[in-house]
Amino acid sequence: MGSGGGGCGRNGAVRQYIRSKVPRLRWTGELHCSFVQAIEFLGGQDKATPKLILQLMGVKGLTISHVKSHLQMYRCSRLGSHGTGRRSEMQPQLQRKHSCGADEQVPREFLCPPLKRTRMGTEATYKGMQGSQGISEMRTTGTQYCIDDYMQAMAMERRIKEEGLRWQRDAAAAAAADGGAAASNLQTVGCSVQESDPFKIIKPEVHHLGPVLKLQCSKVENSGFISSSTGTAARDQPEPPPLEKCSLSLSLGPDPKCMPAIASSPSESSCILSSSSRSFSDCSGNSGCLVAPGVNLELSMSICGS
């Protein structure tokens, strides 16, 4: 053991604890209230000293060592329960504020073991993490709601555009159909085309024939042809009352005078081309070419019922 009555020995051993014969002081509620009042009177736990607290308390049998140890425990409890103690104090106050019962004094926890303080700090940290996670979840949910609203608005706008385009197409189709019907109703002169191999004969409709066409028909009987300006003049004239029907026929065939010559040499001549003004033949064979007078082209026009 070390000499001198204190500290550690040369070997580093701890001095043996000697239990005092004086009984330990038990801090009752009254002593603790007196202790707290003395601290508050001195201006707080940082300004209060054990000597001044002991003088203000004035309790018989209370020593300065008792005040020192109790002040140290009080400071530790205040520092440890500063965050969680305030919440635990506010909850009973709120309950008392909203309840109809009598007010109850909130006990102050000044003796707090280290393990309990650690557990309380861990619970507070876990609750704080849960709160931050809930806030982040709320933000994520709000963002998701904004995205859903934006997608719904875009889909609605796209449907409106599609409906507008469909209405435009329907209106254009209806306008085209109405325009075709109006064009068919407003047509003043019409011609019916009849095909007969190998020629096409254009026959004017009967109810559109006018006086000018009658005059041209009489000229056709004398000259044997009809001018292209007849149809234009007929279109320019107003529509007269319906007249008698006319018939127009065109016949094409070989000249009867050339039939013996063609029948006599069918193999020597390959083709015969002729017209009303001039005639020539392009033939291939052993005996040469055969010149024919022409093809008989006659145009006749007569009034039906005459």
Swiss-Prot record:
Residues 19-79 form the HTH myb-type domain. Pfam families: Myb_DNA-binding (PF00249). InterPro entries: Homeodomain-like_sf, Myb_dom_plants, PHR1-like, SANT/Myb. GO terms for biological process: cell differentiation; floral meristem determinacy; negative regulation of gene expression; regulation of DNA-templated transcription. Its main location: nucleus. The keyword DNA-binding applies. NCBIfam families: myb_SHAQKYF. This is Myb family transcription factor MOF1. The lineage of its organism: Eukaryota, Viridiplantae, Streptophyta, Embryophyta, Tracheophyta. The gene is MOF1.
